[in-house]
């Protein structure tokens, strides 16, 4: 299916629009299986959701969270771990019990086995009800880097140089950015009941335009999301 493109004027509007979609899913399925992107893309949405939780407009206490991706070999105690981001931006402010979180354990001694374990757990849960995703400057979603395989399950991968460069601001230098990662697979994201892809800032324009222009470009992994049954691309970029 062709993506539903929603363009909003500013960050606050983006947060509200994204939060509306998330709340619709959780109200319909209180124990929904949701995967949340870490990083800056989803922050306005998570802040808007936290405000609604504080006002008791929505309850995430039964939501089941599946970690989207992570770096290989980075301990959970490291604040730069993607689970650390998830906990600070989503788990704590939305009051989600940590017992309802399924990890994609990049810190495991055998990350390949951890990926298989994750997919088995996702199968038992019935797949994602909602996938909240950011868009990488090279078109990646989660750590599904180009060239991407739309039939992929959770896997270990080498991080591309483009993704290394975009992560330098969090790690301090190129040398410190991890070069290996684990990620859920595109096949699982495409099959999600609902997909919300967020593109913020001018640096994402080219990737967004390419994603909207195709449903089968391995060099733009996000383009495969057009095959999803219900996908919204949400952006604050004025479209030409």
Give the role of each language-model region.
Residues 1-34:
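N-terminal glycine-/serine-/threonine-rich phosphate-binding loop
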Residues 2, 6, 13-14, 73-240:
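Conserved phosphate- and dinucleotide-binding cores of soluble alpha/beta proteins
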Residues 28-54:
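Glycine-rich N-terminal segment of FAD-binding domains in flavoprotein oxidoreductases
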Residues 36, 65-67, 197, 233:
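Structural beta-sheet core signal
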Residues 20, 24, 47-54, 88, ...:
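Short, well-ordered alpha-helices that flank and scaffold nucleotide-derived cofactor binding pockets
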Residues 51, 57-58, 71:
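Glycine-rich, flexible N-terminal cofactor/catalytic loop recognition
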Residues 61-62, 128:
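Local beta-strand N-terminus motif with an aromatic residue
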